[in-house]
Every structure is written in structure tokens, then in C-alpha cells.
A protein has these predicted regions:
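Eukaryotic scaffold repeat domains enriched in small/polar residues
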Residues: 1-156
């Protein structure tokens, strides 16, 4: 972290594979006091609170749901769900802040809702989910209705 003169105020982590350490961090998102960092070569996401304390980890290397091989884009929605683009499989995995897989969406392909080499992800203030679908040369937009919407009687 830098101040307005460019001086380093603090850093988070160091090289390694332990808790709070990184091996090729590639992306991060900050929302609702959570900092989620894609730790690509450790095949995980690490989650820190506003005091830079590690509060959660997501994933491990593998090819099953909840695992990752080429983690790419990351985002956090208004309910603190963490969305992770898995570039190799063409899916988006959604986790709670404790790292439990909630659901996935997408698959490898060219139809609407499919992805080929997804490379980025953004969630707007209305929980619109934007996925950069690089090989298909498009950005796909989805709307998450969430648990709050279910409680109010809306259909997810």
C-alpha cells in the first residue's frame, strides 16, 4: 500500500506457499472490507480483512468443483460471495467468504452462457456480473438475485 507521495506504507505477504504467502499473485478485489487475492501458482484465493489478517482461503489445485487450475478474474458481490473465473474449464465458481463452494455457472463452449478462456470478471453495485469471455470475443452479463431476493419472494 502506498501513500499519496508513493512511499510504501505496508505490504501483505511474501513469497511462499504458507498462509498469507503468495506464489504469483495475479489479481485482487477489495469490497465490503474484504481483500481477495488470486494466488495463481498456489492454486488458491486468499481472503484478508481490513486489518490484513487472513480470514479465509479458497481452493486447491484440481479439476473438480471448488478446485482450480488457472484461476483468473475475481470479484465480490454485495453479500460477500466471492466469484472466481476458472480460465481452463470455462466456468465461474461462487464461494462464500469461508471458502465453501455455493454454485458454479457456465461451461466450455460458444453458446450464450458458455465460455472459452474466460479471463476477467467484474461485479457492479447492483450485483450485475460481467465475464470477459476472451476466445469468444465478448463480455457476457448476468444478474445475481441473491439470498436477499429469495427472502423477499423473488425468484433467483
Amino acid at each position: 500500500m502506498l501513500d499519496n507521495t508513493g512511499q510504501v506504507l505496508r505490504t501483505i505477504g511474501k513469497h511462499g506457499s504458507g498462509d498469507g504467502e503468495f506464489n504469483f499473485p495475479t489479481e485482487l478485489r477489495l469490497r465490503n472490507g474484504l481483500l481477495a487475492v488470486v494466488d495463481a501458482m498456489n492454486f488458491r484465493v486468499q481472503i484478508f480483512d481490513s486489518g490484513d489478517r487472513l480470514v479465509g482461503k479458497i481452493g486447491k489445485m484440481g479439476d473438480s468443483s471448488g478446485q482450480m487450475y488457472r484461476p483468473k478474474g475475481i470479484a465480490i458481490d454485495s453479500e460477500d460471495h466471492i466469484y472466481l473465473v476458472e480460465g481452463l474449464w470455462g466456468v465461474v465458481q461462487v464461494f462464500d467468504r469461508e471458502g465453501q463452494l455455493l454454485y458454479t455457472f457456465g461451461q466450455r463452449g460458444t453458446r450464450l452462457g458458455d465460455f472459452q478462456l474466460p479471463a476477467g470478471l467484474f461485479i457492479d453495485n447492483s450485483d450485475g456480473v460481467y465475464v470477459v469471455d476472451s476466445y469468444n470475443r465478448r463480455v457476457q452479463v448476468f444478474q445475481y438475485h441473491g439470498l436477499r431476493a429469495q427472502a423477499e419472494g423473488a425468484k433467483p
